[in-house]
Amino acid sequence: MNDLNPQASEYFPYPTVRPHQDQFISAISEAIEARKSVLVEGSNGLGKTIAALSACLPKAIDENLKILYVARTHRQHERVIEELKAIFKRQPVSGIAIRGRHEMCLNDLLIQHPLDTRAIMEICELLKSRGRCKYYRKIEERQREYSELQRQISTRPCTASELQTVCRRTGFCPYELSKSALPDVRVIALSYLYVFDPVIRTAFLSNLETPLSRIILIVDEAHNLPETAVNIASTKLSLFVIKQSENEAKKFKHKDVAAFAKTIRAEIEENVARMSKQELVSPDFLLKLVQEKAGVADPLDFFEHLHDTGVLIKKSLLADGKFPRSYIYTMGYFMLKWHETANDQAYINVVSKYVSKEGIPSARLEIVALDPSKTTMPVFSQVYASVIMSGTLQPMDAYIRITGLQEDTVRNVLPSPFPKEHILPLISCGVTTAMEKRTPEMYRKITRKLKEIVVNTPANTGIFTPSFQVLNALLESGLKNALNKPLFCEHRNMTSRENERMVAEYKEHSTQTGAVLLGVQGGRSSEGVDFPGDEMNSVAIVGLPYAEPTPKVKAQIEYFDERFPGFGREYGYVLPAMKKASQAAGRPIRTPDDKGAMIFLDHRFSSAYCRSFLPAWIQEDLEIVEDEDGAIAHKLNGFFRRVC
């Protein structure tokens, strides 16, 4: 414990410090003391969660600040609270993990309908205001019991699962209980949306009763933030929603809206028939349709009318005891957003063709954000201090520029805690998934190399491809029959629950003869899921996951090139792909005790340029294997004999 500063050691609950954990804590403590942002790249196994909490809590308590710990998954949120429980044994500190309303809600009227976060927020408020939620009503009916429960929740660490269990027993609303506890809780673990979506953030900060200037922000798995930020600022409108708006308008006798929806749908269908799969369109594309074809003189005024009509319909449905969803409201929101962003160079407008889950060809209008900093900078510029951490943040200068962080942001890359002898990183030449090289013979060659990896791996193997197109091509080339172990395969429309079941079954084989998990880079299994021990001895990274060069991707590159001359392709195309590949490659190595091989099956990884974007702990001992039968097997056999 002598390696930690005295303040942090008061909150560090474990008898020993992991390698480089003291450096991690010192870097964060110094940055927070100076009220700066700090970027910390550190691989799994460092104990980043407890290190960040131990470093932030002394200042938070001394200055009466809140700590918001944002992460992608519920599993990560629960982990934060588990670490707080360990701290609680030494120091009285409170914390809560909160989920979205839809995940915490007990009201059948809401949970049986799939909706986006903003729609859920609006409908929840509507249900409460009209007295249609029994779980909310019970708060008033049993105020004394509720207040006591709120006091208990706000004085100690509590996971979202624990809170839901209590509320199922007592009949109170879990979301309202967590919300009412927020002003009195020190640490809140939550999703990116609560902090970075401006609409949701405004409501959340009001409930928190704390401005951004009194918040220390911790962003975990921060390599995901740029993509999440542009997704938050983007929106879409399908032909299905326009058609449903037309039907809804007829039902509620809004003839002007019905005529508008019918005209717009017909015009878009006619234009789409002449278009390729995805095309950029001018903002005037829609505005001219509205004015010239639908006969609307003032588009903005009519879009507000659509929005207001949707609000009235939702209230009417709720009054009749029906689910208050309005397609007209959704259409109105989209049209207002289109008008708002029409002259903003940080947005593009797209028309895309796609096939629905039911296999029906359709199309949609999209408003696509190009600049993550438009979403992230308003947060980073106002918080007391921020800790941004991940295993893949380099090059840090690029990350700082893309997210709009201050130039004086502290940069810290920590050494790997993994013993070098536990890791075997290889690049196999002679194969590639480059578009022009995707031939049946190339897929057969990749399959032979994958067989070599699986056969010479003691237990479980992971295989991650750049896309479902490549994944399916490997299956067609005979991959399943070539393997001597059961194959578990991710598919495009798999739900989160289905994926969890599949991964759990795959992991069970690690104690038997082993199995193979086949998924995509950037997918559910290649990020956010740990495979310690024999759950994944080897991982094969098949190809570079470069995005398909769609008009959207090209526009992103051009936008970054204009903002950061000479870096457009790197920031908008190369970096996102290399981060996905790096995340997938790190799946087998999650603790200092793990031993694993990672094999990059694409000669492009051998270039100095691509290698420079891999994490330092992978780069250090990266070895290029010649394109010869048995070359990979020789390396794997020697490695696993040595470490197993």
How would you name each of these model-derived features?
Residues 1-40:
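Conserved pre-motif I regulatory segment
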Residues 378, 432-466:
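Conserved interdomain hinge at the start of the Helicase C-terminal
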Residues 466-491:
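Conserved helicase motor "Helicase C" RecA-like lobe of SF1/SF2 P-loop NTPases
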Residues 52, 58, 75-78, 82, ...:
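Signature of the SF2 helicase/ATPase Hel1-core->accessory helical subdomain module
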Residues 34-52:
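Walker A/P-loop
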Residues 163-185, 199-207, 308-430, 441-442, ...:
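A contiguous, basic/glycine-rich beta-loop/short-helix subdomain that forms a polymer-engagement track
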Residues 429-441, 492-606:
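Conserved RecA-like P-loop NTPase helicase motor core
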Residues 2-11, 16, 61-188, 196, ...:
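A substrate-engagement module of RecA-like helicase motors
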